[in-house]
């Protein structure tokens, strides 16, 4: 395979992937070739060890950002709000892409997009696919590793700041027509967080008809809800105590009156 054939098949690639394609070439030769292609403009360096090869005539910054995130670490998977955006289920389009990884790596910016690594919850970090709910989807000429809508739902409720806050979260999740509820509940319980179980249970109970939520689904989550009243989030905004979740939920969230929030 020639370098050009490799670039056409790999719009985003790592140094190691290119080195493997050069077979018997020495490390020095590989580095020299990459420098040559960067200098010619055929390849652009994203950061150390990570490159993009845009299609002819296109800007390097037009390469699929979800592919870039996938290649940012060996186990990287697009996550949280970015995963919902990938699936076309985000209320707002962001120029930030979060990705799960167990590797120590720094965030970076390439073009207009900020890439933010996120450590998976410690309860699932060492499990296969960091707890599951990660799929591989063709996109932008490559394969994107990305959280399913089910995992993304639970993750943004577990870490609402990574979902953009309650309005963005609820509006985005309301764009999802169907959830595998057993997958949602299984992953939720794996996180071993009473508050997260309550948040997920509250959301499902609030949309039970649309999402075909059965009492048995809610009962599984209710068993793990907090024993004492807890606020919906750390802002401790006043609201109404909602049973059986023992969550104090602000009125504007209860009624989903987003336009009234300033």
Segment roles from a protein language model:
Residues 12, 50, 77, 107, ...:
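Residue-level preference for alpha-helix termini and adjacent loops
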Residues 23, 88-89, 158, 205:
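Residue-level marker of positions within ordered structural domains that often coincide
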